């Protein structure tokens, strides 16, 4: 799962690198991705996803066996997938940077139609680096970008608003993964939804600008290991580029007693 900012300036040569990299996993490793603010128009002043959709075309990904559907047919901006692993049916929702109200409404309908799937939400901006959801007063809020001026059904949502309007409402939403935020670039939060279910929310961002990175050239990623019998989720942070793990408590941890039924 990739959380966006595949490019820095939303230009062809950067998209070509991003596409060629992810394409190496075709027919080998299933993958899903979202757009970050850097992947949109200049300074995210509008939802310009033309280059994103040129390099990651709907015609290709909609033919994959796990593809479920899209908010807008013909565009990869907001899509969902299903798969089965360890006897569990999973649904992945890939949501745009600062999901609009109408996108959250659509996502809720998708979740409602799949009550027996465990849901993973993959999005660019949701958690903050202080182990809370992004909300009023935080830096890098979607509302602070050009597209944040939209209103009505196109109004954007930060992490706290996403929790209120979508994440907290459905008992089968289990994980939310996000990036975007700098500072330390990591954050973890376990919250209880409206129906008593636990939701495990994580920020993991290793791009340029995060403390401890070297212009982003560290190649770190998260490995999430789910043990159904033990009801345990273990999280490791590893760089195949550096061949090393991050072993501090913010990058190596586990959740116990996870409801995986």
Regions found by a protein language model. Give the residues of each.
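Extended active-site neighborhood of metal-dependent phosphoesterases/phosphodiesterases
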Residues: 12-105, 112-113, 144, 186-207, ...
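Hydrophobic/aromatic residues located in beta-strands of well-ordered beta-sheets
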Residues: 31-33, 119, 176, 201, ...
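N-terminal active-site segment of His-dependent metallophosphoesterases
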Residues: 1-14, 139-142, 261
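A short C-terminal boundary segment appended to hydrolase-like catalytic domains
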Residues: 214-261
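Active-site glycine-centered loops adjacent to acidic/histidine catalytic or metal-binding residues
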Residues: 4-5, 36-37, 124, 179-180
């Amino acid at each position: 799962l990739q959380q966006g900012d595949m490019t820095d300036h939303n230009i062809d040569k950067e998209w070509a690198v991003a596409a060629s990299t992810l394409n190496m996993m075709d027919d080998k490793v299933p993958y899903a991705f979202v757009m970050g603010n850097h992947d949109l128009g200049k300074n995210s002043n509008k939802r310009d996803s033309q280059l994103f959709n040129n390099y990651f075309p709907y015609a290709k990904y909609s033919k994959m066996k796990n593809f479920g559907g899209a908010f807008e047919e013909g565009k990869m901006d907001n899509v969902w997938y299903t798969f089965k692993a360890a006897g569990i049916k999973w649904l992945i929702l890939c949501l745009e940077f600062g999901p609009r109200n109408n996108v959250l409404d659509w996502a809720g309908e998708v979740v409602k139609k799949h009550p027996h799937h465990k849901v993973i939400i993959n999005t660019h901006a949701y958690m903050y680096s202080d182990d809370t959801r992004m909300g009023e007063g935080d830096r890098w809020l979607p509302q602070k970008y050009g597209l944040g001026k939209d209103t009505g059904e196109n109004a954007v949502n930060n992490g706290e608003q996403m929790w209120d309007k979508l994440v907290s409402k459905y008992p089968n939403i289990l994980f939310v993964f996000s990036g975007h935020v700098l500072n330390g670039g990591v954050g973890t939060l376990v919250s209880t939804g409206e129906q008593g279910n636990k939701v495990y929310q994580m920020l993991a961002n290793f791009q340029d600008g995060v403390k401890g990175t070297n212009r982003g050239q560290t190649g770190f990623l998260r490995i999430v290991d789910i043990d159904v019998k033990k009801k345990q989720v273990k999280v490791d942070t590893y760089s195949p580029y550096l061949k090393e793990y991050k072993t501090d408590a913010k990058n190596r941890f586990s959740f116990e007693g996870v409801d995986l039924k």
